Amino acid sequence: MSDSQASLRENVRLLGDCLGESMSNHLGEGFLEKVENIRLLSKNGRQSGDSAALIQALEALDDKEIVPVARAFNQFLNLSNIAEQYHRVHRRRTNESLGVYHNPVGDLLTRLSKQSFTAEQMISSLQSQSIELVLTAHPTEVVRRSLIRKYDNISSELEALDKDNILPLEETKHIRRLKEIITQAWHTDEIREDRPTPVDEAKWGFAVIEQSLWQAVPRFFRQLDEQFSEFSKEDRLPLDLAPIRFATWMGGDRDGNPNVTHKVTKEVTLLARWMAADLYIKDLNVLRSEFSMTQCNEALRARVGDSAQPYREVLRHLENKMLATKNWAKACLDGKPTSGEDIFLDIQELTDDLILCYQSLLDCGMKVIANGSLLDLIRCAATFGATLVRLDVRQDASRHIDALSAITRFYGLGDYAEWDEASRQAFLLTELNSKRPLLPMEWTPTAEVKEVLDTFAMISQGQQNSFGSYVISMASAPSDVLAVALMLKESGVGFPMRIVPLFETLADLDNAEPIIEQLFSIPWYKSYINGRQEVMIGYSDSAKDAGQIAATWGQYRAQEALTRLCKKHGIHLTLFHGRGGTVGRGGGPAHVAILSQPPGSVNGAIRVTEQGEMIRFKFGIPDIAVRSLELYCSAVMEASLIPAEPPKEEWRAIMDEMAEVGMNQYRSIIRGHEDFVPYFRATTPEQELAKLPLGSRPARRRSDGGVESLRAIPWIFAWMQIRLMLPAWLGAESALQQGVESGNLEKLREMHKKWPFFGAYLDMLDMVLAKAEPEIAEYYEKRLVGEELQGLGRLLRGKLKQVSELVKMLKKQERLIEDNKTIRQSIDVRNPYIDPLHYLQAELLYRSRKDEENAEVNKALMITMAGIASGMQNTG
């Protein structure tokens, strides 16, 4: 075992011992022995392949025991996650100290230099880079915010214990503090009593920025400065550089969420302004206290007059103005808006004055001071601006159609919803070019229509830098885009807000190119976009609609087609990737995903959603956040400067055929098998999931619908809970079998090695199959499903075995993910702790369905859901 792995195991053992002590103190040594016995039975069951003794022990638990037992395994898995997350920090620091850390940006620059790229070309690529990470609060984060804070504190204590030459007294102090925090966590309810509000979710997103990203961003820039200085004469990059920025959907995503209203969105924009001002005030205060220097250049002297402390003079002015900005935002939040005079409307004034101080320090021989915390604040200002994040607004296309229908009916023009596409476009373009208002003066819209119109009015009253894109869910025609343009115009929005169609189903992905081409043929629209087009690619719903393999190929083809189209029209395309945390929703390592995009489709710009629990895993700790930013930056630069070769035509033909076969097989089960819906509802906790207060958005689009109305997140969550992982692989077994039987085995292996797109797909499939456990899924079935439905379960498990064997054959592996020992080991270590939660959950589902009012059973059931999600390290 490496020293690195030994460190991880030691931390897991330490945290586990602290948890055991907390449980023993609370519930007695006998309870701890019972939990340990269950763990040993689980471990033995894994080794022997027979979990009968474990199942018997869990079934014997009475209703009063099940909650603490479920909590014990849930909390241990959360502590394991903390240890693993900190281990990534430990490993990086160890490698840096040994001089063996591979910085992804530095490695890329070395490769580019060897390929004759100049420093100027590389810096130019970085300067033109536009990466926007969009934080979203889909209902995937199962851990309570109060527990997240405790987990962050645990990580800090592990860091303190990791220091070389720590004194025994200090070590004792930090271990005592660990025990205290873990005991606090044990005595804290894991399950919220109420769902978080959209504002709660937004505050959590802002907290990630405050506690991690605000520190990570300047550190990331210092790494960039260091890496680029090896190839450039300059020792730092331009001060206004901002290759990565942040946006959010928290408080702006109203698609299917009636809790997100125009008032909520306005409140979130003001909260963002307040938080940004608060962060700047803290840093300005520190700078003002430190910057006692008296010598300055002529430019700064001209600004401050004969002040004896020129730097403090400027910083005091900035701090006071930022305080006024914070007070203005607070007054607006309290419903007592002030005039808003003498506040920061944008960040330019702040950065201009900070750069004035910076240049003065350089001119006066104080370079070491200039390049300290002042430079860090300049970098933060360039990245976060005056608003911290830009807020996207998302709404379903049908809501705009409903609003326009109400207006046309009022005027006696007929029903807009019933018009064909040509009639809709003609009406919209006439109104867009009209000088008279569209909205009737004496008209009372329905509450739903009024909310849509109020949202546009709210945008018009806000500032441009508070908003990102207006995303249209389920976009399927040019009129969907023009409708939003008309609403923006009618509401008096004084800036060209980006209007972004989101293509979600396979059919809409296939139609994306002709839809955008029609828009480009409209002079008004082409003038509006001013040479830049953004399109969002939906991963979740396309996979749910057609199966993962068909959806993945459909997404690739749509991006290719849009890239060609925009190049033909001289339009700069930004693709917005709506990826989730799981494979079934397009998840996976970001750098791998970016490098597997079609050649030319990245072109220096990309937007990506960072969803739910993945935000914490990728950005929750500054060290890990820096690494994540490095990976994004290097991947976008590589994809832009040295894109992969286009796939061979024969590879495309194979993918076309496999995607068709996969889609037909997937749909024949999901839509065509008469037992599918009753089987799904009986064997998974899909119905019970609605009880878990995961997020502010309802799990279903409609309360009366079947699988098609279920959102992609709970759809995947439900299958993951029983370890069948069906959305990520169903259809792939038939597709890959077809490829092999057509005599293309060696070509498929060649595609895996030489085509980044197919390589990424097969490797992600390999990983998710390694997390599947057909024996566990079978137990759920035996405990919960009638014999008349069990034939479908046997069919599905047979297909799971088939696809697993095919992946191993294609990759020449004896075992799944044999080529990724880190993930393989993580899964193997976790399984003995997750297994009891699965078997317990199946038993709880059985009890709950017999007695829905049993509070202890229902609480334990929700704890098992949270624990399994934590153990699997992803939810939906």
Swiss-Prot record:
The yes or no answer to whether the keyword Transmembrane helix is present is no
> Which residues does the Swiss-Prot or TrEMBL record annotate as the active site?
138, 544
Give GO MF terms, alphabetically: magnesium ion binding; phosphoenolpyruvate carboxylase activity
EC number(s) recorded for this UniProt protein: 4.1.1.31
Q: What keywords tag this UniProt record?
A: Carbon dioxide fixation, Lyase, Magnesium
What this protein catalyses is: oxaloacetate + phosphate = phosphoenolpyruvate + hydrogencarbonate
A GO cellular-component term linked to this record = cytosol
The enzyme's first-digit EC class, named in words, is: lyase
Mind listing the GO biological process terms from this record? carbon fixation; oxaloacetate metabolic process; tricarboxylic acid cycle
- Protein family: Belongs to the PEPCase type 1 family.
- HAMAP family given in the database record: PEPcase_type1 (MF_00595)
Entry function: Forms oxaloacetate, a four-carbon dicarboxylic acid source for the tricarboxylic acid cycle.
Name the UniProt record assigns to this protein:
Phosphoenolpyruvate carboxylase
Originating species:
Marinomonas sp. (strain MWYL1)
